[in-house]
Regions:
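Structural recognition of the beta-strand scaffold that forms the well-ordered cores
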Residues: 44-47, 53-56, 71-72, 120-123, ...
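Catalytic-site signature segments of enzymes, centered on catalytic residues
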Residues: 64-65, 130-192
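Active-site helix/loop module of the DD-peptidase/beta-lactamase fold
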Residues: 69, 88-128, 151, 180-192
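Aromatic- and histidine-enriched alpha-helix N-cap/loop-to-helix transition segments
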Residues: 71-77, 113-116, 162-170
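N-terminal pre-domain segments of enzymes
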Residues: 1-22
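Extracellular/periplasmic catalytic domains that process cell-envelope and extracellular macromolecules
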Residues: 38-40, 61-62, 92, 111-116, ...
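Active-site SXXK
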Residues: 51, 68-94, 121, 172-176
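A short, well-structured edge-of-sheet supersecondary motif
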Residues: 33-62
Length: 192
């Protein structure tokens, strides 16, 4: 279908006057004015209701063509993909992480690493004290990110110690790819 084709080139949303989707211009304006006043740096705003863009705008110097780094928004997409895969029976919150990467398991995994589950990755309480040293462009490393994560020390019992852990999100994405045969992005596009 045309919608599927558009998604492969970038998401294209339908537009609609906000009134037709049941939103109030007074409330929209109040929100934008409050955001402008209270939030230190605003780049852009888009409100989608019932699958239609009903309001959008940009603060100078940004515009529609300005790319934005999403940072932690990736965690929301990844956890959505995990939830969908769970609903399809492809994995469980209580699955051990090592189950998905038998070729990457360290020679002598710690008991804490063996105990790490999908739910621990989602909650960012993997038992790590520090993040695994995963870098986008590290010419010195020949190991995969998965292998690097699994080789990183897990001094705490999973589920007992919180650490904001971006590599845990990568591991969730790798699990989704493992159980679906698709990248997280392609899997989400096929479902949403």
């Amino acid at each position: 279908p045309a919608r599927k084709k558009a998604a492969t080139k970038g998401v294209s949303f339908r537009r609609s006057p906000h009134e037709q989707q049941g939103t109030s211009s007074t409330d929209l304006l109040a929100f934008v004015e409050a955001a402008d006043k209270e939030i230190d740096t605003m780049n852009s705003f888009m409100l989608i209701r019932h699958g239609h863009v009903v309001a959008e705008g940009w603060w100078t110097p940004y515009d529609r063509e300005t790319p934005h780094i999403l940072f932690s928004l990736s965690k929301s997409f990844t956890s959505t993909a995990v939830g969908l895969a769970i609903s399809e029976g492809k994995l469980s919150l209580d699955d051990q992480v090592l189950k998905f990467f038998p070729e990457e398991v360290p020679a002598e995994p710690s008991s804490n690493l063996k105990a790490m589950r999908v739910r621990d990755l989602l909650r960012m309480n993997t038992g790590n004290q520090t993040e695994a040293p995963i870098r986008v462009a590290d010419p010195k490393s020949t190991d995969s990110w998965t292998k690097t994560f699994l080789a990183h020390p897990v001094p705490f019992k999973p589920g007992t110690h919180f650490l904001y852990n971006s590599p845990a999100t990568f591991m969730l994405s790798a699990i989704v790819q493992n159980v679906t045969g698709m990248t997280t992005r392609d899997y989400l596009r096929s479902k949403l």
